[in-house]
């Protein structure tokens, strides 16, 4: 039962929000509409990739750190192949997602250290031997993932507003020149 709980927490509050955040960032960088079916398919593909690669890491097929590089590399290939996004924009969006994820995880870790204390936080993060410890660690990641999605949504809406403003200025310039 605890294995199922960990699996569900990891998927619903870990892989899916991070995949959605990466997809939102990709769509922001390329000025695509989030309401499209392609966004949801991209999120699903990104989630599946992350689940498979992280599972390979969890069963010691991949060393720590390499799983992130592999996941991001495949995300870039999906963005180029499936989403038809130019390579540089794909790379920029995934790297920007990585920066956002790192920042939100640092903010969350700092907050948890303030709340629980450094020693307790370190114990929570290092207790991966027991199923309870792994569940606690997964739950501790939820605030960072929520914050990550909020940050990339803000980024998306700022980019959309800037694009709208630019289009309005161009339309105004054209109408003035007529």
Regions found by a protein language model. Give the residues of each.
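Short helix-perturbing small/polar motifs within transmembrane alpha-helices
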Residues: 32, 46, 50-51, 71-97, ...
